Amino acid sequence: AAAQDAPTLNTPGWLYRSWLAAYGEETTRAISLAHGERAALDLTVASDPVGWSAKLDARLLPTGGLRRVTSGPITALPGYDAGAWWVQDAAASLPARLLGDVAGKSVIDMCAAPGGKAAQLAAAGATITAVDLSERRMERLVSNMGRLGFTMEAVHGDAASWRPAELVDAVLLDAP
């Protein structure tokens, strides 16, 4: 009976049957229904999360970030062009927060692209060196940081072998 619902739930029959065998009917239906829900958009703001929460019709998260459940192009949202916020999953914002107060400190962000954590650190007053192996992703990081109005040193390099010229206060590595 549940397998007959698979097309209605926008889940391919073969996938639904696989889940059904692995998880049972109740969990399979829950997974299928969850896949049909609109994904939330998490944002990190440079400042004034309460104010931006109202402007963006977003919920303020315990991490200090925002979550929107409405859709539309992000470039059309208030504050995008001004660099007031950037897209960053709430969980992805946690590693930078764990460094504590980084104001005035030098921080290397390894595997840095697309730049959400580097932006967090820059917004908190750190001097950033962003290192990433992918030239294409590094170009995106530089573009993102430019839109946000943050400066940093961009290094195209391998986190496994690159070494800084000088000691720094902290290194952030949230490797893929």
Feature map (PLM): residue ranges:
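S-adenosylmethionine
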Residues: A1-P176
